Design a protein with these regions (language model features):
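Membrane-proximal soluble helical/coiled-coil segments
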Residues: 49-151, 157-159
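Amphipathic alpha-helical scaffolding segments comprising HEAT/armadillo-like alpha-solenoid repeats
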Residues: 69-82, 102-114, 133-145, 164-177, ...
Length: 327
C-alpha cells in the first residue's frame, strides 16, 4: 500500500512539474512575441488576442498592427469565411473583419447586405460601420429598410459610428423624404441628431412640420443638436404649440440647447403644460438660459399652479446641485 501511495504521489508531482514547465514556456514565448512576429501568427487564439488589444494602443501603433495582421495566414483564413457556404461562418467572418479594419473587404460586405440570412446582413451592417465605410451608407440604409429594423439601435450605431463624415450621405437620403418610409426618416433623423451635423438644416426645419408625429419629434430634436440658428429657434417655438406633447417636450429641450432667450416668455407660459415631461423639459431649458432663466424660475415658485411651483423648485435645486459639484 505504501508503495502505491508513493507511486501516486510521484505521478502527481510529475504532472505538476510538466504543467508548470508548459505554462512557463508559454509565458516566455508570449514575452518574446514582438510586432514582427505578428505577420506569422498561425493561431486563431493569438489573432483574437491581438484584436482585443488594439483599442488600448495608440492610433499609429494600432494601424501598424492591423496592417501586419491582415497579412497573417490566420487572418486570411478568417477573411475567406466571407464566402463560406455556412451562414453562421459568414456572419462570424463579418464580425472579424469589422474588428480587423481591412477596408479591402468593403465591396464583399456590401454584397453581403443582400445575403439571404438576416443575421449575416446585420453583421455586415455592423462591420461596415466599424470600417467607417461612408460610401456604403445608401446600401446600409436600404439593408436596414429591408430588415424593417430602424428601431434596432445596434444597426443605427453602425451609421452613428461613422460620425460627421456620413452627414452628406444621410442628407442625400433625407432629401428624398417623399420616397422614404416614415421609419427610415425617423432613423436617419436620429442618426443626424447623434452626429450633430446636418448638411441641409432647411430640410430638417421642413420635416419639423411632417404629418407623422414621431418624425416631427426627431426633426425638432435635430434642430437642438446641430449648429444653432435663429431660424431653428423659430421652428422650435412654433413646435411648442404642437397638439402632441412629445413634440412640445422635445421642442422645449431643443430651445434650451439653442440658448435662445427669445423663447423665455413662451417657456414661462408652458410651465403649466398638462404633460409632465413638457413641464420637465421646459424647466430644464429655462435653467440653462443663465440668470434670466433662473429669475423666471424663481418667479414661478410663487405661481398659483402647484405643478408649476414644484417643477420650478426641482429645476432650481438641480442647477444649484450642478453648480456646487462644478465648484
Amino acid at each position: 500500500m505504501l508503495l502505491v501511495l508513493t507511486a501516486l504521489a510521484a505521478l502527481l508531482l510529475a504532472t505538476l512539474l510538466v504543467f508548470n514547465w508548459w505554462h512557463r514556456r508559454r509565458d516566455e514565448r508570449l514575452a518574446r512575441l514582438s510586432l514582427d512576429d505578428l505577420t506569422h501568427a498561425e493561431s486563431r487564439l493569438e489573432l483574437v488576442a491581438c484584436l482585443e488589444a488594439l483599442p488600448g494602443l495608440h492610433a499609429t501603433e494600432a494601424a501598424r498592427v492591423r496592417d501586419m495582421l491582415c497579412l497573417s495566414p490566420a487572418a486570411r483564413r478568417e477573411l475567406a469565411g466571407l464566402r463560406h457556404g455556412s451562414a453562421s461562418r459568414r456572419a462570424e467572418a463579418c464580425r472579424f473583419v469589422g474588428r480587423l479594419g481591412d477596408t479591402a473587404v468593403v465591396p464583399r460586405l456590401v454584397e453581403l447586405l443582400c445575403d439571404q440570412d438576416p443575421a449575416v446582413r446585420r453583421e455586415a451592417i455592423r462591420a461596415l460601420g466599424e470600417l467607417r465605410a461612408v460610401e456604403a451608407v445608401p446600401d446600409i440604409a436600404d439593408a436596414i429598410e429591408g430588415l424593417k429594423e430602424w428601431s434596432n439601435l445596434v444597426l443605427l450605431m453602425a451609421l452613428i459610428r461613422m460620425g460627421p463624415a456620413c452627414a452628406p450621405a444621410i442628407g442625400a437620403l433625407l432629401a428624398e423624404h417623399g420616397a422614404r418610409s416614415p421609419a427610415m426618416l425617423k432613423g436617419l433623423l436620429q442618426v443626424t441628431s447623434r452626429i450633430g451635423v446636418a448638411t441641409d438644416p432647411a430640410m430638417i426645419r421642413a420635416l419639423a412640420s411632417h404629418e407623422d408625429m414621431e418624425i416631427r419629434v426627431e426633426a425638432v430634436r435635430v434642430l437642438g443638436a446641430i449648429e444653432p440658428d435663429p431660424r431653428s429657434g423659430d421652428v422650435c417655438l412654433a413646435a411648442m404649440d404642437d397638439a402632441e406633447w412629445p413634440v412640445r417636450a422635445i421642442a422645449a429641450s431643443s430651445l434650451g440647447r439653442l440658448r435662445d432667450e427669445r423663447a423665455l416668455a413662451r417657456l414661462r407660459g408652458a410651465m403649466g403644460d398638462p404633460a409632465y415631461w413638457v413641464r420637465h423639459h421646459v424647466a430644464e431649458a429655462m435653467a440653462s438660459m443663465g440668470e434670466a432663466g433662473s429669475e423666471s424660475l424663481r418667479d414661478a415658485l410663487h405661481a398659483a399652479n402647484p405643478f408649476v411651483r414644484d417643477m420650478a423648485a426641482q429645476a432650481l435645486f438641480m442647477r444649484a446641485l450642478a453648480e456646487g459639484e462644478a465648484a
